[in-house]
A protein has these predicted regions:
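Juxtamembrane "anchor/assembly" segments of surface/extracellular structural proteins
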Residues: 1-78, 110-152
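Short amphipathic beta-strand/extended segments with alternating polar/hydrophobic composition
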Residues: 30-42, 95-100, 232-236
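Short beta-strand and beta-hairpin "edge-sheet" elements
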Residues: 37-38, 84-119, 211-216
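Short, flexible loop/turn elements at secondary-structure junctions
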Residues: 66-70, 89, 100-103, 121-123, ...
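Charged- and aromatic-enriched interaction segments used to assemble
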Residues: 108-236
Length: 236
């Protein structure tokens, strides 16, 4: 994919932190970036907070509110992986995700119009991708290899740097679970050889570990909320 920067915005929050927003679009041609004017409530990041604390995957979403006098049609798409955004705080990645598929349709009659742009995090967006074999055919692979493989399908710019696992369990006397648990990846295909989507594969791993997977910053975390009060260390 050839993602190119199309919009950016920078501002200070109430604590004087510098917030940078960048929006990219997959395009075969050359695009010129423009600056967006954000509203006072520019960014809202929401994490799933339902009653099921032990849910295997907890996703997040983001809303970016902008003011414009123009029709920003290139911010709208019917595809789930054509546009993504990054939000940084003081130069460090805070959140990234892909736009919610939608079509542009509105009339512009006022001087400034408020547009609310919706994005889903990288874990939620994995549902748009089907699992593929690591080695072009079925093989025994580690959980870590599976996770890195499915993330690489969506994260072409390698924004996700780390995978952390809560030191709640051990295998072979080590907390490095992901490199010591293996599976035949044929299990991610049905009898008709139809692949599961990558989000379901990640959920399978989280369930097997007995942990909850979530995304934050440049990392993915697996956490056992049962004993997080007693153990709060992680293996990278």
């Amino acid at each position: 994919m050839g993602y190119q920067l199309i919009y950016n915005s920078s501002f200070k929050d109430i604590d004087e932190n510098t917030i940078n927003i960048e929006i990219y679009r997959d395009s075969g041609g050359t695009l010129i970036a423009s600056e967006l004017l954000c509203s006072a409530d520019a960014v809202s990041i929401n994490y799933e907070s339902d009653d099921d604390v032990f849910k295997p995957i907890k996703c997040s979403d983001c809303q970016i509110n902008v003011l414009t006098t123009k029709v920003l049609a290139n911010l709208y798409t019917a595809l789930g992986n054509q546009i993504y955004c990054t939000i940084s705080k003081n130069g460090s990645l805070l959140w990234c995700g892909y736009s919610v598929p939608c079509l542009y349709s509105t009339d512009y009659n006022e001087e400034y119009n408020l547009l609310s742009l919706q994005f889903n995090d990288i874990l939620s967006s994995l549902s748009n991708y089907n699992y593929t074999y690591l080695n072009e055919k079925q093989s025994i692979v580690s959980f870590y290899q599976v996770i890195k493989h499915i993330i690489s399908q969506i994260d072409s710019n390698r924004l996700i740097k780390n995978v952390y696992v809560h030191n709640a369990k051990k295998i072979n006397d080590t907390t490095d679970l992901l490199n010591n648990l293996f599976i035949l990846d044929r299990n991610f295909f049905d009898e008709a050889n139809e692949a599961e989507n990558c989000k379901d594969v990640l959920e399978y791993i989280a369930r097997y570990l007995g942990m909850t997977c979530y995304y934050y910053g440049d990392s993915i975390y697996f956490v056992d909320y049962d004993i997080i009060k007693n153990i709060n260390s992680y293996t990278k």
